[in-house]
Each structure stands twice: as structure tokens, then as C-alpha cells.
Amino acid sequence: MAAKLISTGFRHTTLPENYVRPISDRPRLSEVSQLEDFPLIDLSSTDRSFLIQQIHQACARFGFFQVINHGVNKQIIDEMVSVAREFFSMSMEEKMKLYSDDPTKTTRLSTSFNVKKEEVNNWRDYLRLHCYPIHKYVNEWPSNPPSFKEIVSKYSREVREVGFKIEELISESLGLEKDYMKKVLGEQGQHMAVNYYPPCPEPELTYGLPAHTDPNALTILLQDTTVCGLQILIDGQWFAVNPHPDAFVINIGDQLQALSNGVYKSVWHRAVTNTENPRLSVASFLCPADCAVMSPAKPLWEAEDDETKPVYKDFTYAEYYKKFWSRNLDQEHCLENFLNN
């Protein structure tokens, strides 16, 4: 079982066979462009109407944007990164106490994405945590490093508030009431994936994570500021998203694409590797309550002309999440299964 993890400290000189992608499904890193006009939004702006306009343009055009002056203290962010690095540098024996291939487990260390279903693995280890309500899950979290529970608890609370603030702005940017998303999504769950991508001997042959969309409502990503690895697909072209100091990367998940009736996009994105440096990222996912019914917001289609109809049929988040995990990560957009005929 221990051989499944790649965060061992061992430096491979060639890529093991089970990570090598077919020629037609390789990242073609030389064809990736730099995204020069990637939105950077200052959440401390006092001009709310301008802020809402920026959010609308970013969500409709890119499905991604970065935010600065978001309210999370730099010390909390630095501590989160530090304790995550410390976790992955622990001994295999210590880490394997948390290892599981079962995606239903609320706290688990695993590798790739869904190893039970994959034919080719991804160059990634990750620690998956449920973070809300914290008191329900914190005792499952790693006891080592000793500061892990305290730091992650603090970070999770802060990031949750950032997410709520952004969801309000997104609601308003669609012309909806400020609290529309909050009401529809219900008591939102919160998950975290602490991703670790070791140096890879042949980055052009594999992925850290292949192209995928996020099944949740909103993702708040803390990127490693020293290594670029996130790429997004726009108009058929892959673009690298360079990390910005002290910024979070925000992306629209599948549920907000459905709620916006397709106005906002849950965009394909991927993580690539490099030969020199390990890369760390911390993704926080805000998720609708399992029983929350997802359907295109009526004000977005009822008042329009007769040809404007809901793009997606109604479904619960529990139904969607089950479908998402029953498939390979890089299959068709999971929302395709919920289109209105």
C-alpha cells in the first residue's frame, strides 16, 4: 500500500509506467500560453458596483479570478502552507495511518484522484478533509504535526467567510438578491484538499491532475507562490495562471454554472508538474447542502423571451456528487448528465 504514495522523498529518474499518458492525452506544455489579462480583483474596494461588474466579467469570461485584500491574515496563510509542507515531509509510516482509497471517507490521505477507477495515475498525493462543522471532524484530522488541527481550523474559518463574501457578490452580479446563493445552497459543507506534487522526471508525459471541473459551488485555492502549475482552458487554448502574492484563486464550480443557467462557466482546468520543485496547493471547496435542490435561478429565465428556458433540470447536490465520483475525472463535463432535453 505504501508504494501508492509518491511523497516519499525518492527522486525518480524516469516516469513509472502507470503515470504515462497516451500520446493523444499529454499536456503539450510547449503549446501553453501565459494569461496576461487574468482578472485580479481587490475585495477591499469601496465601489461595490464596480466590484460587482468585475465579478460578472470574470465569471462569464473566465470562470476564474484572483482576489487580493480578501481579509485573511498573511500569518494564517503562511502557517497553513508551512504545516501542509510539514505534513507531507513526515515519514511514510506516519502518513500511512491516514491512507484510504475510499472517496466516502471524510478524512483521508490518498494519491492520484480515484485510483480504483483510473487506468493511468496522476502525479499527486493529497490530504482530503471535511472542515464544516469543524467540531464534527477535527478529531479525525492528523494529530501530527502537533499544530495541524489548530492551524487548519483557523484557516478554514477565515476562508469560509471569504467564500460567503464572494457568493454574495456573485449573486448581485447576476442581478439576484445578495443572499440568493446563501438561501439556495443551504448550510454549506466545506471540504479541503491539500495537494502535493513532487518533482516529476518527465512532466510532458503526465499530469498532476488532468482536465476537470469542480463539482461544488465555489473553490478558493491557495497556490504555491514559487511554482506555477495551474492551467485553465479558454476557447480551446490552455493558459498558465501565474500565482500572485497574497492572492486566492477563485473558480466557479458546477453548481454555480447550473444556478446561473449557464451564464457563468465552471471551466476546465488542470495541474501540471515540473522537474525541479515540489508544488503545494490548498483548495477549499464550498458545497451545497446534500438536500439542496440545484436549478437555474428563475429570475434569469422566467422574465426573458419565450425561447429562454432553464438549461439544466433540477437535481440535489447529493445526486450530483454521487454521479461525479462514479466517473473518471477527465470524462465529459458532469453537468452534461443534467441537461434539460
UniProtKB/Swiss-Prot annotation:
Disruption phenotype: In the double mutant eds1-2 dmr6-1 and in dmr6-2, reduced susceptibility to the downy mildew pathogen Hyaloperonospora arabidopsidis. Reduced hyphal growth due to immature haustoria, often with aberrant shapes. Reduced susceptibility to Pseudomonas syringae pv. tomato DC3000 and the oomycete Phytophthora capsici, associated with enhanced defense gene expression and elevated salicylic acid levels. Normal susceptibility to P. syringae pv. tomato and Golovinomyces orontii. Enhanced expression of a subset of defense-associated genes. SUPFAM superfamilies: Clavaminate synthase-like. One of its GO terms (biological process) is salicylic acid catabolic process. It comes from the Eukaryota. 2-oxoglutarate binds at R279. Coiled coil: none annotated. Keywords: Dioxygenase, Iron, Metal-binding, NAD, Oxidoreductase, Plant defense. Induction: Locally induced during infections with both compatible and incompatible Hyaloperonospora arabidopsidis isolates, specifically in cells containing haustoria or directly surrounding the intercellular hyphae. Induced by the salicylic acid analog BTH. Accumulates in constitutive defense mutants (e.g. sid2 and npr1 mutants). Accumulates upon infection with the downy mildew Hyaloperonospora arabidopsidis, the powdery mildew Erysiphe orontii, and the bacterium Pseudomonas syringae as well as salicylic acid (SA) treatment. Residues 188-288 form the Fe2OG dioxygenase domain. Its cofactor is Fe(2+). It catalyses: salicylate + NADH + O2 + H(+) = 2,3-dihydroxybenzoate + NAD(+) + H2O. Binds 1 Fe(2+) ion per subunit. Fe cation binds at H212, D214, H269. Converts salicylic acid (SA) to 2,3-dihydroxybenzoic acid (2,3-DHBA). Suppressor of immunity. Regulates negatively defense associated genes expression (e.g. PR-1, PR-2, and PR-5). Negative regulator of defense against Hyaloperonospora arabidopsidis. This is Protein DOWNY MILDEW RESISTANCE 6.
